[in-house]
């Protein structure tokens, strides 16, 4: 995959449930602590190395941000780092928390 693919939150949720991809959240620490998808890994400059050690390049990665804009840049960056399949989630956490309120965790 030379380019990331945009997917909606329903497709992202399905991929997560079926363990077809991992989910990363790139929002700031305060926003992440105030609510994030239950299975999301908080991806920051400080946690990138750990994420890359724990997830092979053939692991599909879904990137979530606030509304689905910042995630596109991060998705492109992950492709450049060597990940084979990367998705940007349209609507971001804002839409996720509306569609899946039971699957929101709080705290860091």
From Swiss-Prot:
Gene Ontology CC: cytoplasm
Signal peptide: none
Compartments it resides in: Cytoplasm
Gene Ontology molecular function: any one: thiosulfate-cyanide sulfurtransferase activity
Highest taxon of source: Bacteria
Residues annotated as catalytic: 65 (cysteine persulfide intermediate)
Record GO biological process: glycerol metabolic process
InterPro entries linked: GlpE_sulfurtransferase, Rhodanese-like_dom, Rhodanese-like_dom_sf, Thiosulf_sulfurTrfase
Keywords: Cytoplasm, Transferase
CDD domains, alphabetized: GlpE_ST
Reactions that this protein is recorded to catalyse: thiosulfate + hydrogen cyanide = thiocyanate + sulfite + 2 H(+); thiosulfate + [thioredoxin]-dithiol = [thioredoxin]-disulfide + hydrogen sulfide + sulfite + 2 H(+)
Keyword Ion transport appears in the UniProt entry: no
Pfam family, one: Rhodanese
Top-level EC class as recorded in UniProt: transferase
Ranges where the Rhodanese domain occurs: 17-105
Enzyme nomenclature, EC number: 2.8.1.1
SMART domains assigned to the protein according to its UniProt record, in alphabetical order: RHOD
Family: Belongs to the GlpE family.
Function: Transferase that catalyzes the transfer of sulfur from thiosulfate to thiophilic acceptors such as cyanide or dithiols. May function in a CysM-independent thiosulfate assimilation pathway by catalyzing the conversion of thiosulfate to sulfite, which can then be used for L-cysteine biosynthesis.
Protein name stated in the entry: Thiosulfate sulfurtransferase GlpE
